[in-house]
Amino acid sequence: MTPELTFSRLAGGTRSAQLLVVGPSLGTAVTGLWGECAALLDGRFEVVGWDLPGHGNSLAATGPFTVPTLAAVVRDRAVALAAGRPAAYAGVSLGGTLAFEFADDPGPFTAAVSIASAPRLGEPRAWRERAALVRRAGTPVMVTSSAERWFAPGFTDRSPAVASALLTALSKTDRRSYAWACEALADLDPSNAVRPTAVPLLVVAGAQDVVVPPEVAEVGARSYAGVSCRVLPGCGHLPPAEDPAATAAILDGALIDEDAA
């Protein structure tokens, strides 16, 4: 099925020279994940984020969905949002898998950035087991383990409000939508062939990410000819929240369209 996604403006406006669409990680609300980073991009981009089904501001899903279906919805909405301006995409984890979709079929996007992600994330069996657990017990059952996986050591002590907001959003996520998102990740079946990209693609990894370690992100980058992987020191699985300034600097360097500036 085609899910309904809610898009929210995080920074800038329609007079901004470029559009940047940003995507969330599984279990997060895009405003909590990207809000501070988006504010640092204000003036150069109109930053618009989308929420996964049943997450943040998006309605709960009524049936299963796939990563390519999510990409199609985001691609189509970006055409209208861009209104002829240059448009770029950046996403984290599950949201980052869409960057690989756009590297092959970009639609309006002229560049894409995948953060803490890879063309295939984890093992299908583990995703299906997690889906079954959350259907049975709800998303609060994921809070403790996610706190351990999401953040670099010491982050929750340094930034307790940010970590708490992200984990609260996880606990409020619709259980069926979360489970279907897990199954969408289980169903990812990327090509093993090295291929060119239709638009520039950058892969970014957190140096202390235990979910998608830098070496896994680098393997994903090597799936595409000429694509490099940048590593953010001190970050775990959610760099836009853990180090908004460093993430914004990478996006500025990778995505600024000089013709539109």
Describe the residue ranges of each PLM region.
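Conserved HGGG/HGGXW glycine-rich cap/lid loop of the alpha/beta-hydrolase fold
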Residues: 2-60
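Active-site loop/oxyanion-hole signature of alpha/beta-hydrolase fold enzymes
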Residues: 35-39, 46-90, 249
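Gly/Ala-rich beta-loop-alpha elbow adjacent to hydrolase catalytic centers
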Residues: 91-95, 99
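Flexible "cap/lid" loop of the alpha/beta hydrolase fold
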Residues: 100-143
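Conserved alpha/beta-hydrolase catalytic His-Asp/Glu region
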Residues: 122-125, 137-196
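Short beta-strand/loop motif that positions the catalytic acidic residue
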Residues: 197, 203-205, 209
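Catalytic histidine-centered segment of alpha/beta-hydrolase-like enzymes
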Residues: 235-248
